[in-house]
A protein has these predicted regions:
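Formylglycine-dependent sulfatase
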Residues: 1-229
Length: 229
């Protein structure tokens, strides 16, 4: 995807979770066609780099995470992971606005992945239960996406920007049966594992408040975006 977009004249940027390989540097975002990267190559690397002894399971995942920029070393960042990533995405929008080239930002938040660790300002709105923490993390995702959309609006980028919001899989049943009424969960091939929302916003191109019942696959994204550029 980034190679195709760069070939069409776009600058390409990845913010957040990578999760597409980290043992070999050839699998890292910069080597895979992104002009910039800020985030983490694997969820366990939020706790620090792997060693022969493993990694520190006791270190928090979401709080004061260890993150990487481009091909650089891990650096500790202060705050909640979601806040740090959305601030990076917003800062990036400010930079690409000033350039003449079109741009692509791949913003992969980690929420609401386990461990269930919402920021305090969201956790305080819900009961201190697995369900409450999960709902707080969903609210935190909504707030982060809302900030990105508001930045696009304020920067006069909304009309020319296609926004796609999607999840990679259904919820895990490790903590709560979050996929009801669908059967199954993450790591299964039933609806509970595969059926996720797909939201798209592109004013003057995609009509508002339209629900489409057709099945969409991740395999559709590449040819669809390729046809648009």
């Amino acid at each position: 995807m980034p190679d195709m977009l760069r070939g069409a004249g776009y600058t390409t940027h990845h913010v957040g979770k990578w999760h597409l390989g980290y043992v070999s540097e050839q699998a890292w975002p910069i080597q895979q066609g992104f002009d910039s990267f800020f985030g983490f190559l694997d969820q366990f690397l939020l706790r620090g780099p792997h060693t022969d002894a493993g990694y520190n399971l006791k270190r928090p995942t979401y709080v004061n995470p260890l993150l990487q920029r481009d091909n650089g070393a891990f650096e500790k960042h202060t705050g909640h992971l979601s806040d740090i990533l959305v601030e990076e995405a917003i800062d990036l929008l400010g930079r690409v606005k000033e350039q003449e080239q079109p741009w692509f930002i791949n913003y992969w938040t980690y929420l609401p992945h386990t461990p269930l660790t919402p920021a305090t300002r969201f956790a305080s709105k819900f009961p201190d239960t697995p369900e409450g923490k999960y709902n707080a993390m969903l609210m935190q995702v909504d707030a982060a996406v809302g900030r990105v959309l508001a930045t696009l609006d304020a920067s006069d980028l909304t009309r020319s920007t296609l926004v796609i919001v999607v999840s990679d899989n259904g919820g895990t049943e490790k903590h709560l049966p979050s996929n009801q009424p669908f059967i199954g969960a993450k790591n299964t091939f039933t609806e509970g594992g595969l059926r996720t929302p797909l939201l798209m916003r592109w004013p003057e191109v995609i009509p508002k408040n339209v629900v489409i019942d057709e099945t969409v696959s991740y395999l559709d994204y590449f040819p669809t975006l390729e046809s648009l550029v």
